[in-house]
């Protein structure tokens, strides 16, 4: 009887331990939590670690958290294990690391190698499976060696863009230059190398040192023997983009679209209705123009109007203008041809190159009435209100969807009312999502961004607290004509400055 009791006790104990083990496994966090006390030490111990810079109030961070944890769990069993970590970059004690790594929005992920000596932006997916696949590739060699025809077929494939270096030996200046570029661009491009060009699946055998870039479009492969660092990088980047990038709903085209918009070249974009009667004729003529201008530092894209709503919103375009061509230069000047016809494409490009096409400015209409305390500025009125008015102007660049901008609006109204009897001061706002901004004067990377331009033209960014009294003090200090006295100041707002919303990109 005693034995049976002991047996029952043993079974219960084992079950308890088993359940406890399961619960422990369920509650275990695989993402390392870093702060100012352990950040440097932890990074220095890892040859490869990913760090998420986040803020607790950031909605995108909250959405990423469970996917990041799932990925960390799976990668913990990788050989060798890959570490994922996070740090609250909004915490005052941790802000030194946010500054060190130039964090401008949340979440931002960085890949740190060699104990933090090498830093790379994470540009991969934001769901668990994609994170795992991306990081497994990133943790491997920057360039894989091809030792057989079978391995070459596997690496190059039919749909991959791969730069393959061919060398007589795996050493020397050319090899070192190639490997350095592979390491630099490993996040966005695939690299391989071989001692025998006969393994390569396409093209005649090439004598090394040389680089053959394989691609599933246009001429299918292209060679280069220039191993100068800048020239080699330019070759890889430019050769990896189709002569004419296609922007539609096909996910296979999306990586090329991303590379197109990342290119520093002048970008020519034609948007048409792909199912329209003249679509094929338009695309054919556009490709002819692209072919004849391929050496003119122009990148070409043709987009289906139905799949390009984001581009339409960004450039301020209307569907009634389709088919259209818009050109964007590296200094952000834009040139627009709306309702273009087949026989106008070639001549319009010639006019553009001859400097005969006027710059297009994205702008909302100038408001018929502008009687509110905070004056509405649009691109077309920016010169008159800000640059040529001879006034001291505090201007907010905002986005309608930005929560911080919405909270700031009533405060700026109060500031404007306090200066209503001072004709030398203007408090203004501009919707930066609907109007072009002169980037050489105003550097707008997040919302809200606030600038002050004095009556004589001195421009300074506002970096103070977002309270009525702080704004008033700032304007009085920087104005070149002393404003009159103002009303009683309100109590300071407790809302801290945050930059979850970023203008340059959607963090997810």
Curated annotation (Swiss-Prot):
Keyword set includes Signal: yes
Top EC class of this enzyme: isomerase
Catalytic activity: Catalyzes the rearrangement of -S-S- bonds in proteins
Keywords, alphabetical: Disulfide bond, Endoplasmic reticulum, Glycoprotein, Isomerase, Redox-active center, Repeat, Signal
Compartment(s) where it occurs, according to its Swiss-Prot or TrEMBL record: Endoplasmic reticulum lumen
BP terms from Gene Ontology: photoinhibition; response to endoplasmic reticulum stress; response to high light intensity
Motif Prevents secretion from ER: positions: 505-508
Carbohydrate-modified residues: 38, 273
Site annotation Contributes to redox potential value: residues: 59-60, 403-404
Active-site residues annotated for this sequence: 58, 61, 402, 405
Disulfide bonds: 58-61, 402-405
Keyword Transcription: no
InterPro entries the UniProt entry points to: PDI_thioredoxin-like_dom, Prot_disulphide_isomerase, Thioredoxin-like_sf, Thioredoxin_CS, Thioredoxin_domain
EC number: 5.3.4.1
Residues marked Lowers pKa of C-terminal Cys of second active site (site): 466
Superkingdom to which the source organism belongs: Eukaryota
GO molecular function annotations of the record: protein disulfide isomerase activity
Site-annotated residues for Lowers pKa of C-terminal Cys of first active site: 126
Family under the similarity heading: Belongs to the protein disulfide isomerase family.
Cited function: Acts as a protein-folding catalyst that interacts with nascent polypeptides to catalyze the formation, isomerization, and reduction or oxidation of disulfide bonds.
Record-given protein name: Protein disulfide isomerase-like 1-2
Gene name per UniProt: PDIL1-2
């Amino acid at each position: 009887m005693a034995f049976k009791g002991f047996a029952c006790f043993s079974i219960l104990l084992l079950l308890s331990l088993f359940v406890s083990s399961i619960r422990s496994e369920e509650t275990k966090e695989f993402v390392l939590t870093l702060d100012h006390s352990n950040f440097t030490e932890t990074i220095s111990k890892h040859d490869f670690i990913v760090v998420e810079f986040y803020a607790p109030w950031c909605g995108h961070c909250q959405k990423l958290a469970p996917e990041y944890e799932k990925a960390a769990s799976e990668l913990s069993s990788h050989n060798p294990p890959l570490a994922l970590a996070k740090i609250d970059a909004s915490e005052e004690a941790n802000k030194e690391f946010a500054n060190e790594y130039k964090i401008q929005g949340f979440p931002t992920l960085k890949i740190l190698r060699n104990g933090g000596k090498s830093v790379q932006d994470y540009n991969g997916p934001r769901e668990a499976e994609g994170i795992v696949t991306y990081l497994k590739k990133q943790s491997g060699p920057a360039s894989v060696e091809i030792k057989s025809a079978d391995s070459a077929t596997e690496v190059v494939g039919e749909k991959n863009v791969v730069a393959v270096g061919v060398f007589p030996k795996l050493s020397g200046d050319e090899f070192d230059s190639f490997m350095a570029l592979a390491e630099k661009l490993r996040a966005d491009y695939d690299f391989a190398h071989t001692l025998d060009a006969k393994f390569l699946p396409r093209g005649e055998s090439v004598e090394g040192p040389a680089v053959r870039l394989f691609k599933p479009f246009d001429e299918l492969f292209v060679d280069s023997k220039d191993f100068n660092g800048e020239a080699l990088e330019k070759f890889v980047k430019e050769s990896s983009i189709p002569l004419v990038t296609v922007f539609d709903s096909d996910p296979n085209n999306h990586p090329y679209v991303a590379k197109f918009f990342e290119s520093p070249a002048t970008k020519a974009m034609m948007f048409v209705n792909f199912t329209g009667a003249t679509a094929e004729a338009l695309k054919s003529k556009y490709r002819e123009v692209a072919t004849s201008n391929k050496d003119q530092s122009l990148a070409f894209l043709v987009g289906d109007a139905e799949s390009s709503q984001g581009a339409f919103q960004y450039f301020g375009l209307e569907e009634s203008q389709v088919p259209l061509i818009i050109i964007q230069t590296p200094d952000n000047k834009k040139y627009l041809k709306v309702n273009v016809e087949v026989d106008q494409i070639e001549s319009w490009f010639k006019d553009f190159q001859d400097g005969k096409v006027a710059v297009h400015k994205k702008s909302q209409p100038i408001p018929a009435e502008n009687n509110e305390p905070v004056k509405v500025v649009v691109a077309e009125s920016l010169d008159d209100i800000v640059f040529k008015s001879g006034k001291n102007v505090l201007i907010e660049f905002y986005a309608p969807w930005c929560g911080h901008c919405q909270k700031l609006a009533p405060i700026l109204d109060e500031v404007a009312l306090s200066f209503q009897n001072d004709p030398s001061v203007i408090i203004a706002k501009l919707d930066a999502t609907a109007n072009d901004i002169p980037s050489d004067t105003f550097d707008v990377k997040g919302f809200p961004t606030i600038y002050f331009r004095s009556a004589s033209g001195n421009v300074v960014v506002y970096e103070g607290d977002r309270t009525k009294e702080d704004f008033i003090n700032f304007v009085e200090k920087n104005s070149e004509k002393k404003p009159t006295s103002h009303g009683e100041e309100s109590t300071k707002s407790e809302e801290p400055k945050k930059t979850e919303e970023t203008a340059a990109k959607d963090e997810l």
